[in-house]
Structure formats: structure tokens, C-alpha cells
């Protein structure tokens, strides 16, 4: 089964997450199929909080990938922010 989930990066006390498409059997920070964006929960100043390639996410969801609950919420947030920017 293929999932869209977060993988942690960044420094201690300053997390940064990549949003990836991966096989469910892979470790959290293990192999991935494709990186479709990032999430920065502690963005400051002019830093972006969410960057997401919605076309690729839509492609993977149509092909059976299941987003985790957190990623599903991030997709909704990214969709709203892109609609507001347009």
C-alpha cells in the first residue's frame, strides 16, 4: 500500500517535515517514491509554512495512495491558501 506521509528533518527543537509518497512498509525516514512538498510548523518571518505540489498529490491519490490524517489536513490548508492567493 502506498501512503502520503511526513518525514522529519531539521534540527533539534526546530522540526521540518518533507511530505513524501512512500510504501507503508518503509521506515519513517527511509526510502520514498516521490517528494511532493514540505511543511515547516515553526516558520518565522518570510518563511513558507507549507509548499505542496497539489497536481502530484492528486495524481497519487487517484492512483490509490492514502494520505495520513495530518497530511490530509495540510492538503486542505494548502488548497485554501492557493485559492486565496489566486
Curated annotation (Swiss-Prot):
InterPro entries: Ribosomal_bS16 (IPR000307), Ribosomal_bS16_CS (IPR020592), Ribosomal_bS16_dom_sf (IPR023803). PROSITE patterns: RIBOSOMAL_S16. The keyword Phosphoprotein does not apply. The keyword Ribosomal protein applies. One of its GO terms (molecular function) is structural constituent of ribosome. One of its GO terms (cellular component) is small ribosomal subunit. Keywords: Ribonucleoprotein, Ribosomal protein. Disulfide bonds: none annotated. Belongs to the bacterial ribosomal protein bS16 family. This is Small ribosomal subunit protein bS16. It comes from Stenotrophomonas maltophilia (strain K279a).
